Amino acid sequence: KLSGNFEIGGQDHFYLETHVALTIPGENDEYQVWSSTQHPTEVQHGVGNVLNIPSAKIDSKVRRLGGGFGGKESQATIFAAMSALGAFITQKPVKIRLNRHTDMTATGKRHNFKVFFTVGFTTTGKLLALDIKLLSNGGNVLDLSGPVITRALTHLDNCYFIKSLKAIGYV
């Protein structure tokens, strides 16, 4: 039996282009939303929810997809919604381009973790049991904190069969 704890450092997504969103009002409550996102469908639904109009009236566009390292998966929706709300109110195009400092402080990160564990094994090293608690620092932005802790919990056994496993996670 072995017990202990350790920490895993977090990581900022450092994509080259900061978050950008441009919303152009159209006819019949339709909006064209250009966003630097990895998830145009989420932007479409998020903007529709904020404006309280069907997402079918939101034309979500992205010029280039990729290179965000996960940092533009859900976070871009926030800035697209801000741009869309401004365009909705003014009925004029509204563009938001974050500077690096604002982008880094306003968006989520790859979470740092503190891990507490007790592991049981045979004298030959065969893994028998694991009792583990994961503490994930979601920081000031929850965005993907739920999916991050879920993934950590469901993948922590990796390729091992652990007959007795108790895993708890907190954000």
Task: Identify the function of each model-found stretch.
Residues 1-171:
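Structural alpha/beta core scaffold segments of enzyme domains
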